[in-house]
């Protein structure tokens, strides 16, 4: 029936947020340490993001020190801010990267970042697609653990 086709759905669609933004001032990103790297999550206050930006201080100097490669759903863009590193994966030879270099890859491929410079290495990683909620949950867990470690006993 034409009336049924033109009728509004019974449940309204979820509203689409327009004009969202999140400002993260220098030094104010949500920080979460792991044994492998230090992660800084800008825009941590913005929920339901379509991508997750992460500034990573790459500390591991070998895949063994990383404890192996990781994989997660989605895609990842990596841009080296300072220092040098290698992107290791289960499909390609190690890829050397220096300041200003970038790579876009399927993060379902096992991967890991290894610092090759003596000086500190920092990268901007932007994760998008399937699996980013898992990354957000991991970030929240890392922050909780970091805060608990800082509490006096």
Regions found by a protein language model. Give the residues of each.
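Conserved hydrophobic/aromatic beta-strand scaffold that supports enzyme active sites
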Residues: 39-41, 53-57, 77, 102-104
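Short beta-strand His + acidic residue motifs that chelate non-heme Fe in jelly-roll/DSBH
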Residues: 87-88, 95, 111-117
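Short acidic-glycine-tyrosine-enriched beta hairpin
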Residues: 91-108
């Amino acid at each position: 029936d034409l009336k049924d086709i033109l009728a509004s759905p019974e449940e309204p669609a979820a509203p689409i947020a327009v004009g969202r933004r999140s400002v993260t001032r220098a030094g104010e990103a949500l920080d979460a340490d792991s044994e492998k790297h230090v992660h800084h999550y800008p825009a941590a206050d913005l929920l339901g993001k379509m991508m997750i930006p992460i500034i990573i201080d790459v500390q591991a100097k070998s895949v063994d020190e990383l404890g192996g490669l990781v994989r997660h759903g989605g895609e990842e863009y990596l841009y080296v801010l300072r220092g040098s590193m290698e992107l290791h994966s289960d499909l390609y030879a190690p890829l050397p990267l220096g300041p200003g270099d970038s790579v876009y890859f399927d993060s379902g491929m096992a991967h890991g970042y290894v610092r090759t410079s003596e000086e500190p290495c920092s990268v901007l990683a932007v994760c998008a697609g399937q699996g980013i909620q898992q990354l957000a949950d991991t970030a929240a867990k890392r922050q909780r653990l970091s805060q608990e470690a800082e509490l006096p006993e």
